[in-house]
Amino acid sequence: MYSTSLLRWLVVALVSAVPLVTAYGFVPYPQNDAFYYPPDGWQNTERGDILKDRKIQAATLGILKWNLDAWQVLYRTSGARPNTPSYTVTTVLVPYNAKRDHVVTIASPENSNFIQCAPSYAFRHTGVLEIANFEPRWEQMLYTLFLAEGWVVNAPDHEGPESAFSAGRLGGHMMLDSMRALQKYGPLNIPDNAMHIGHGYSGGSTPTGWAASLLERYAPELNVVGWSMGGSMTDPLYTLDSLDGNPTSSLVLAGALGIVDAYRDEVGNYLHDNVLTDEGKIAEKVMRNSCVYEAVIRYFGATFQSERYMKDGRKLSSFPELTHLTDMNTMGRYPQYTPKKPFRMFHALHDEEIAWHQANKTAVEWCNNGANVNFITFSSNDLVHVTTYLWNLPYLVQYMRDRFSNKDFYGGNCQFDVEPNNPLFDTSILGERFKELLEAVLDILGKKIGPKDSIILNMIKSGKNPNKGGVWNDVLKSTTVSPGEGGNKSPESKKATKKYKSESKAEKKQPDSIPSSSSKSSSDNKSAHAKYHAHGHGHGHASSNSNNGHSHSAKESSTSKGSSRRHVARFM
């Protein structure tokens, strides 16, 4: 019903929009937009301070205007390390009759190494049909669900100027500092005690999970009342390895590049100089100049961990400099980084892109260390990566309503639920019109819904489903557990619980330096982090900026006591 009409609409819109390129021109790309460059002295500001601001006309697909107030602010934040100054942009959407003490911060899946793919640019009204960077744009269509509740929506560019895809700690810092920035920005009138909820799906789960993990140490003053994430990439190395040779295998190289870029001042151009072949370097250039769908099409089904792209055909796991970084960005690995606020996680058992059991393992480890988690497994063969997100939206909104109302969340314990059936779209939660919206979005994405979904069946038949190593549908049962009791009866849950019980209660020490065998590639590892240094091409922070950072307490927190609040700091 929707496919034909929507396809026709898109074709007509595309043809109609072509003349607009000449007639009206583009809104500048981020790499050409002065707004994205911080003023002199920005390193000496506090986390969450506003460096620049502007009011914008928000839009979807570049041409569909949103009838609400929207601002963008450039704010001070941190890179992968809390003492490394950085900056990024967030986009704030304020509906009519907004509840300004209800803020939903959403990490849109960017999944790329190119600043042009940032969510902030995807929100701009360009006057031209924009479909190249479709990853954040299709999710933005769903923000209406949160705006209709009267909630303020905050959407930070969580990959930062490095476009550091899959660098969880960096994204976590940037999410938390975006919440601080909203409370400091006068035109928004967000109260200091505003309630915040963080959410992210798929590529957006990485910064969300780490924001939740870092909250108590990095931004304890924020009144966060809950977290939500699904289709979660909690173990970056495992996920990248499992994607290799699959349709979205471009994410293997993009993810590895992103993590290294986040720590460039420590490991330099490690992948480029030590790992990639000449063909691999060509692929790297493509990643640094493409959004996710362009890269996926270009390298559809490629095997990056092969002699064609990596020296000697080695796997990512064979490079200690890289595994050190992925270990640091694996959720649940360090007990001291356990979320303390209510957390809803959901995942399809047969997710064809991000393996269920690594997300489940993280939920178990978090629970064992005192988290308050509800982990929902959807075991139906009909639910895959995208459909699981869309059909869960009504229940996500209900969860957020409950969190803003401070309702009990499993008495502080953990709840592991198994749902064997597809979620029924409850129109009593959102209404019939939103059901139609989700069905339309599904049609745009080309995802089939229904019994014997050909997508998941083909993935299983071809052996390319990342869960082929273990799908434990027959042993999964809903259960309530306390710390130390595990989560469910899957092998991964048992393994995580056994490990928890056998270890001492002493905290694991977080590695603070790269292994001594690491070889930095060139003297430009120390170069200044100037105006998005080769902006949009993945070059990241330089260590010279870290010397300008403020000292931090053991909790890594900074409450910006010395900074002016509720105004824009000017350093022109």
From Swiss-Prot:
InterPro entries: AB_hydrolase_fold, Lipase_secreted. Its main location: secreted. Glycans are attached at residues 360, 525. The active site is at 202 (nucleophile), 351, 385. Residues 512-525, 541-562 have a biased composition (Low complexity). Gene3D superfamilies: 1.10.260.130, alpha/beta hydrolase (3.40.50.1820). The keyword Glycoprotein applies. It catalyses: a triacylglycerol + H2O = a diacylglycerol + a fatty acid + H(+); a monoacylglycerol + H2O = glycerol + a fatty acid + H(+); a diacylglycerol + H2O = a monoacylglycerol + a fatty acid + H(+). Keywords: Cell wall, Disulfide bond, Glycoprotein, Hydrolase, Lipid degradation, Lipid metabolism, Secreted, Signal, Virulence. Its EC number is 3.1.1.-, 3.1.1.3. Residues 468-572 are annotated as: Disordered. Residues 1-23 form the signal peptide. It is found in: Secreted; Secreted, Cell wall. Belongs to the AB hydrolase superfamily. Lipase family. Class Lip subfamily. Secreted lipase involved in Dandruff and seborrheic dermatitis (D/SD) probably via lipase-mediated breakdown of sebaceous lipids and release of irritating free fatty acids. Shows only minimal activity against triolein. Mostly converts monoolein to di- and triolein, while free fatty acids are only produced in low amounts. This is Secreted triacylglycerol lipase LIP6. It comes from Malassezia globosa (strain ATCC MYA-4612 / CBS 7966).
